[in-house]
Each structure stands twice: as structure tokens, then as C-alpha cells.
Curated annotation (Swiss-Prot):
FAD binds at I14, G15, E35, S36, L43, G44, V45, R106, V132, R191, D310. PANTHER family: 5-METHYLPHENAZINE-1-CARBOXYLATE 1-MONOOXYGENASE, MONOOXYGENASE. This is 5-methylphenazine-1-carboxylate 1-monooxygenase. It comes from Pseudomonas aeruginosa (strain ATCC 15692 / DSM 22644 / CIP 104116 / JCM 14847 / LMG 12228 / 1C / PRS 101 / PAO1). Coiled coil: none annotated. The gene is phzS.
């Protein structure tokens, strides 16, 4: 990139903030993030960052902050509703990667990224309370109509617009006005974070199923709690939506859920060494939403506009890959703009580098979801072999040692 350019990123989530840091590190123009929320707060629950994305964040200078905050996940362990191990596999460094797989609170990761952006790019780099409403390309510029928290219209312009504005992306809607609705996986999820006793080695993710396809996923996400001999546990309870009696496609990541709705599905579980009832009842806030994704796009952007993260490739959480792919999007976008002085061509290079991988993961996550639910009702001996095959196939498709 020879001439300085102005870049607007719609959305100051994990993908948008990572992209801003990568663009700044590459010395590419002036970067401004527009965030529709009036205040960026550490919301959400736990997520996983895969080794490739951890490496990318380390190269942005965030390795020490991650290590001080997150849990390096060592093992993925599948168990039955009695707590007996069905299948397990190593993760992160234990699986031969040079970098760990980190489990971390989404809000804490966002705050790490936000602090780095404000320190390196300046406080003015993140403008809150501005939601994108109108987009137009004219004379080699992207013109954006936004509205602030008081309803006052704002006019902005840039050489590049990056839509990192999430599942209900305004930028994606502009680029793909005929987009299909969210695709429902037929699963309702309840999620929460609970201060809990340490379990197993304090670095293990557990996945438990019963024969009725109710599922629990739980893993620790806080280095601070671990240092105190305890765990901050992220948990997800998944139940077929038909059993819940609702099929809601309106995904809202901050919708409140109710203990009395989720607890009956796990009332007869006895994991022995892990008290699921205690985990759920000690939780302060329960979130509820459907498991959804979007069909892969044949192209992401056009001209001087592109997408990244959930705006480009919303995927099921089965492979714990969504946030990692958003981070890798941002890294590749910065690299493409650094290589190519033609902005539009650089954006297409970025898309060609990232879209096939992201689309493959969308489909692989759908397939893994079907296969794991199908394996739930099998006898234990068959289930072990099935899970070994499922996880091995997934690794071969979407993971690579880092």
C-alpha cells in the first residue's frame, strides 16, 4: 500500500478490533471503528481461541495479556450422563501445536483488544453510539450514513468499509439484500458463566450427552480464578428445540433465559464428580438463543467494501471456531492491503484467501453437529469409535498444527 487510506470498520467486536490492530501494525492508513452500542462493556460468556488465532494475537503483541487472563485448554473429554469418559483428545500444545488453545471470557478478550486499540491508535479510533444505516460508493469513496445514540444523523466517508458488525450486519444486508434468513439448527441453547469448584485438572473441556440428545458443554475460562484454586466455568446446555416447544430464528445474544426452563432437561443427570444442578443454580445470568448459522456466500464484498467475522460467515459453535476465524480474517485483510496498492483488488485477494476456508468450516460444523447428535444414542463402545472418527475428520478438514 503506497498511499495512506482511510478505513472504517463497522463493529468493535473481536474481529473488528483484531483487524484494526493488524492494519495499524502494517502501517496502513487511518483506521476508525464504528460501534452501534453507546458503551463497550465486557458482555457475553466463554469462547475458545484456536492455536492459529492465538499465534496471530501473539504476533500483535497480546501474548502476555492472553496468558494472564485465559485458560490453556489441555483436553476435550466426552462423558456420558453418569460422568464416565467416552472419548477424549488432547488440545492446544498437548496436541502438538506450538501455541495453546485458550478458553476465555468473550468480554475479557474484547477488553484486551479494545485497550490495545485505544493505546496504539488513540482514543478517537473507536466511536461508540454510531450504527451504520446507509452505504453508497461514489467516486472511489464509500459514503456512510450513520445515526448516533441521540438519533442525530452523521455522514462519514472512507476509502474502505469493513463490515464486522456481526450476525445482523447492516453492511452484509447492503451487499446482499436478497440474503436468505438465518438457518436454524433445531437446537435451543442456554448459556452462562458460574464461579465453581475446580474440576479435573482445571484445564479440561467436558461434553456430556444423554440418550435424549440433551447436552452439556463446560470449561474453565479464568486464569485469575485458577490461581485461587477455583474455576470460572462457561457452560452451554443444548436441547432439541422441538422438546422446548419453540423454534425461534431471532438470534439475540443477550436474551435472558430462565433456570426453570433448562433445569428439567438435566434433572436426572448424576455426573458424580460434577454437580450440574449446582452449576446451573449458582449462575447469576442465563442467556437463551437458538443455534443458527447462515448459508455460505459465493462472494463477500464488492468494490471497496468487504465483510469479516460473523457478518461474513456465521457458523454453528460445534467446532469452537467462530472468534478464531474472525481474528484470522482481520490478519489476512491487513496483509492483503499491505501487498496490493489497488484497494478493490486487495479486498478481493483477502476474500479469495479467507472465504473458501470459512465456508468449509460452516459446512463442517453443520456436519459435526449432525454426527455428534446421532452418536449420542449409540452404545458406549460404538459411541467411542464414532466420536474418534468425528473429531479426527473435523481436525483433518479445518485444523492445522500451529
Amino acid at each position: 500500500m503506497s498511499e495512506p487510506i482511510d478505513i472504517l470498520i463497522a463493529g468493535a467486536g473481536i474481529g473488528g478490533l483484531s483487524c484494526a490492530l493488524a492494519l495499524h501494525q502494517a502501517g496502513i492508513g487511518k483506521v476508525t471503528l464504528l460501534e452501534s452500542s453507546s458503551e463497550i462493556r465486557p458482555l457475553g460468556v466463554g469462547i475458545n481461541i484456536q492455536p492459529a488465532a492465538v499465534e496471530a494475537l501473539a504476533e500483535l503483541g497480546l501474548g502476555p495479556a492472553l496468558a494472564a487472563t485465559a485458560i490453556p485448554t489441555h483436553e476435550l473429554r466426552y462423558i456420558d450422563q453418569s460422568g464416565a469418559t467416552v472419548w477424549s483428545e488432547p488440545r492446544g500444545v498437548e496436541a502438538g501445536n506450538a501455541y495453546p488453545q485458550y478458553s476465555i471470557h468473550r468480554g475479557e478478550l474484547q477488553m484486551i483488544l479494545l485497550a490495545a486499540v485505544r493505546e496504539r491508535l488513540g482514543q478517537q479510533a473507536v466511536r461508540t453510539g454510531l450504527g451504520v444505516e446507509r452505504i453508497e460508493e461514489r467516486d472511489g469513496r464509500v459514503l456512510i450514513g450513520a445515526r448516533d445514540g441521540h438519533g442525530k444523523p452523521q455522514a462519514l466517508g472512507a476509502d474502505v468499509l469493513v463490515g464486522a458488525d456481526g450476525i445482523h450486519s447492516a453492511v452484509r444486508a447492503h451487499l446482499h439484500p436478497d440474503q436468505r434468513p438465518l438457518s436454524h439448527g433445531g437446537i435451543t441453547m442456554w448459556r452462562g458463566v458460574t464461579e465453581f469448584d475446580r474440576f479435573l485438572d482445571g484445564k479440561t473441556m467436558i461434553v456430556a450427552n444423554d440418550e435424549h440428545w440433551s447436552r452439556l458443554v463446560a470449561y474453565p475460562i479464568s486464569a485469575r480464578h485458577a490461581a485461587e484454586g477455583k474455576s470460572l466455568v462457561n457452560w452451554v446446555c443444548m436441547v432439541p428445540s422441538a422438546a422446548v416447544g419453540q423454534l425461534d430464528n431471532e438470534a439475540d445474544w443477550n436474551r435472558d433465559g430462565r433456570l426453570e426452563d433448562v433445569l428439567p432437561f438435566f434433572a436426572d443427570w448424576d455426573l458424580g464428580w460434577f454437580d450440574i444442578r449446582d452449576l446451573l443454580t449458582r449462575n447469576q445470568l442465563i442467556l437463551q438463543y437458538p443455534m443458527v448459522d447462515r448459508d455460505p456466500l459465493p462472494h463477500w464484498g464488492r468494490g471497496r467494501i468487504t465483510l469479516l467475522g460473523d457478518a461474513a460467515h456465521l457458523m454453528y459453535p460445534m467446532g469452537a471456531n467462530g472468534a478464531s476465524q474472525a481474528i484470522l480474517d482481520g490478519i489476512e485483510l491487513a496483509a492483503a492491503l499491505a501487498r496490493n496498492a489497488d484497494v478493490a483488488a486487495a479486498l478481493r485477494e483477502y476474500e479469495e484467501a479467507r472465504r473458501p476456508t470459512a465456508n468449509k468450516i460452516i459446512l463442517a460444523n453443520r456436519e459435526r453437529e449432525k454426527e455428534e447428535w446421532a452418536a449420542a444414542s449409540r452404545p458406549k463402545t460404538e459411541k467411542s469409535a464414532a466420536l474418534e472418527a468425528i473429531t479426527g475428520s473435523y481436525r483433518n478438514q479445518v485444523e492445522r498444527p500451529r
